[in-house]
Amino acid sequence: MQFRGNVMQENQNQAAEAVENEMTETASAAHTELEQTPEQRIAGLEAEIAELNDTLLRARAELENQRRRAQDEVAAAHKYAIGKFAAELVTVKDYLEMALLDQSGQIDALKMGVDMTLKQLVSAFDKAQIKDIAPKLGDKLDPHQHQAMSAEESDAEPNTVVRVMQKGYLLADRVLRPAMVVVAKAKA
């Protein structure tokens, strides 16, 4: 018990000394401020204001630089976003130009070249997540993916596809071009 009491007494003494030291430092700082003339006090505060203004200006400049860099990165991303797709299309264009330059007159070779070109284009579309919208005959008209170009009397159920005039395309899940279709209407 005696030992515990000594430790507690020592801790209390240390705490009291810490409080006393803090009070002395505070009083000393206050005393120093009191010893300053108003002009010195104003000059000190003006220097502090100038330092804070400088810090603020630097922070604003850094923020503006970050904003500008972010805008530049977004602009570059927009500008070069289709780079891979464009590279794929260049190959397709090369194949088409070679087919046009071919003067051999061999229809089978031309057909094979066009088939290879189509495969290259389909591969480019797959890589770019471009998919066909190719409704089948009898499919219900989907106004999100189909555009009814006309309606014709048919034995088919009304508002179903009876003919596809042109395929549509999706980019991922967004419609690039709706499929152009003719839909059935009830016979009069």
Curated annotation (Swiss-Prot):
A GO term, aspect molecular function: adenyl-nucleotide exchange factor activity
This protein's UniProt keywords: Chaperone, Cytoplasm, Stress response
Pfam families, A to Z: GrpE
A cellular component annotation (GO) from this entry: cytosol
Entries under PROSITE patterns matching the protein: GRPE (PS01071)
Domain of life (superkingdom): Bacteria
Subcellular localization, as worded in the UniProt entry: Cytoplasm
SUPFAM superfamilies according to UniProt: Coiled-coil domain of nucleotide exchange factor GrpE, Head domain of nucleotide exchange factor GrpE
Function per UniProt: Participates actively in the response to hyperosmotic and heat shock by preventing the aggregation of stress-denatured proteins, in association with DnaK and GrpE. It is the nucleotide exchange factor for DnaK and may function as a thermosensor. Unfolded proteins bind initially to DnaJ; upon interaction with the DnaJ-bound protein, DnaK hydrolyzes its bound ATP, resulting in the formation of a stable complex. GrpE releases ADP from DnaK; ATP binding to DnaK triggers the release of the substrate protein, thus completing the reaction cycle.
Protein name per the record: Protein GrpE
Annotated gene: grpE
